[in-house]
């Protein structure tokens, strides 16, 4: 016969949610830092291509 599982306590649920939020926050900070370094031109380890718009292409 099936037996219902015990409930997860509020404190354990809150701890898990806090850990998840902290991981998301760290990813946000890292992405923002990378974006800043790219925009300021100080990035030495990230390569990207830039496209220049020609006036001939739009005509």
From Swiss-Prot:
PANTHER family xref list: 50S RIBOSOMAL PROTEIN L32, CHLOROPLASTIC, LARGE RIBOSOMAL SUBUNIT PROTEIN BL32C
Family to which the UniProt record says this protein belongs: Belongs to the bacterial ribosomal protein bL32 family.
Listed GO MF terms: structural constituent of ribosome
Tree of life domain: Eukaryota
Compartments where located: Plastid, Chloroplast
Stated name of the protein: Large ribosomal subunit protein bL32c
Keywords for this protein: Chloroplast, Plastid, Ribonucleoprotein, Ribosomal protein
Keyword Chloroplast among UniProt keywords: yes
Cellular component annotations (GO), alphabetically ordered: chloroplast; large ribosomal subunit
Keyword field contains Ribosomal protein: yes
One Gene Ontology term from the biological process aspect of the record: translation
């Amino acid at each position: 016969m099936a037996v219902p599982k015990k409930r997860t306590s509020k404190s354990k649920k809150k701890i898990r949610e806090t850990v998840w939020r902290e991981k998301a926050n760290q990813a946000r900070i890292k992405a923002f830092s990378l974006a800043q370094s790219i925009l300021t031109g100080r990035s030495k380890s990230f390569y990207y291509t830039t496209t220049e718009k020609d006036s001939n292409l739009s005509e």
